[in-house]
């Protein structure tokens, strides 16, 4: 990738001059400027932490608020991830994708500057420090589902070249002041040539969200993002984690819990108890069915993200009817069990480069 060698080689001043010519929407920050904005990366300014390092809240001289993602340790791998994220953030412009404000690359400091989103991540509202406040009513959940789907659809169908995110999960869906979704964290993203159906690569991401073909064989495609998004939808609908632990020795993927209930049309039992019954039944049903059709094990049977957007909006009665009558939702004969989820496992990162806490990553960990 051209950008990677661009960051790793050459003088900093040369890099700045070239990048300033290529962008009018973001800029190169000086380390001194970001130190001032974050009170010298003060602990009290820290709003998230992960394997990459830390995220800090900051305020620029003009009063605008920013989130600064600071790499913890410089290394060739970290440099590559930094370069990939800056390049992709610089390429994409969509209301449901996190916007790049700029970057800093001085000495061994690598920092990414983005908009500060005051409502943090989706995971913080479902499972983290904001979950007790119950700020996600049903209308907000539907808006988050559709908005994040539209952001991912942009990556798959409108970006040039196409982009596979490879790390879609609840902690990478951030929420602005109006609870509008912004998909974040492009450090693991891949650019896909027009003539390619997939890329074979080292597996990275989070167990519980990984598509089976990617987890087992390293085959990454847009369909892998669709699978991961299906898991996020189930979390949105149910308030449960991607992998639940009903007992200390049992780990249950959310798909294996939800699918039998969906087949029996027991959607009320899937709904998040924190909603207290305040949801639109038809929309809940739609979200759950879309989630499960996305997260089935066979990639060729998953919808595209454009189809997911259409289904979530419920604009085509014919498509909704086809969804409800899909064979995967037919009740199974007694004694027959069909596992549609990926391999069982913990929700810990499988890559040494990524390690997120439930309430970490308010800019994208």
Where are these regions (language model features)?
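Conserved catalytic-loop aspartate of Hanks-type protein kinases
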Residues: 225
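Membrane-proximal cytoplasmic juxtamembrane segment of single-pass receptors
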Residues: 1-98, 107-113, 119-120, 128-142, ...
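Protein kinase catalytic-loop region centered on the HRD/HxD motif
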Residues: 150-163
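A short, aromatic-enriched beta-strand patch in the conserved N-lobe beta-sheet
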Residues: 102-103
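Activation segment
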Residues: 217-222
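Intrinsically disordered, low-complexity cytosolic regulatory tails
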Residues: 1-24, 280-286, 290, 297-365
């Amino acid at each position: 990738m051209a950008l990677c060698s661009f960051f790793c080689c050459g003088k900093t001043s040369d890099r700045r001059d070239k990048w300033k010519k290529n962008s009018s929407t973001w800029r190169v920050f000086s380390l001194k400027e970001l130190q001032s904005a974050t009170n010298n990366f003060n602990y009290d300014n820290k709003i998230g932490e992960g394997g990459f390092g830390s995220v800090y809240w900051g305020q620029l001289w003009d009063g605008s608020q920013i989130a600064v993602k600071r790499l913890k340790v410089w290394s060739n791998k970290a440099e590559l991830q930094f370069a990939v994220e800056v390049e992709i953030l610089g390429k994409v412009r969509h209301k449901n994708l996190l916007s790049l404000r700029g970057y800093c690359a001085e000495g061994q400091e690598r920092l990414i500057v983005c908009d500060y989103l005051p409502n943090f991540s989706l995971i913080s509202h479902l499972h983290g420090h904001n979950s007790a406040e119950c700020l996600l009513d049903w209308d907000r959940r539907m808006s988050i589902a559709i908005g994040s789907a539209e952001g991912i659809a942009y990556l798959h169908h409108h970006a040039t070249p196409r982009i596979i995110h490879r790390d879609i999960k609840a902690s990478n869906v951030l929420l602005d002041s109006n609870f509008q979704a912004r998909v974040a964290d492009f450090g693991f993203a891949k650019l896909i040539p027009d003539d390619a159906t997939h890329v074979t690569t080292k597996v990275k991401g989070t167990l519980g969200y990984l598509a089976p073909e990617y987890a087992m064989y390293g085959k990454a495609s847009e369909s892998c993002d669709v699978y991961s998004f299906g898991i996020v939808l189930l979390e949105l609908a149910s308030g449960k984690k991607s992998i639940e632990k009903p007992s200390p020795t049992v780990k249950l993927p959310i798909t294996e819990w939800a699918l039998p209930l969906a087949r029996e049309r027991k959607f009320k039992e899937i709904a998040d108890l924190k909603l207290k019954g305040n949801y639109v039944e038809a929309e809940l049903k739609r979200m759950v069915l879309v989630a499960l059709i996305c997260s089935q094990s066979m990639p060729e049977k998953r919808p595209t993200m454009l189809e997911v957007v259409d289904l979530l909006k419920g604009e085509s009665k014919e498509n909704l009817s086809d969804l409800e009558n899909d064979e995967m939702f037919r009740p199974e004969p007694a004694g027959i069990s069909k596992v549609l989820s990926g391999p069982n496992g913990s929700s810990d990162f499988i890559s040494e480069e990524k390690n997120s806490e439930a309430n970490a990553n308010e800019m994208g960990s």
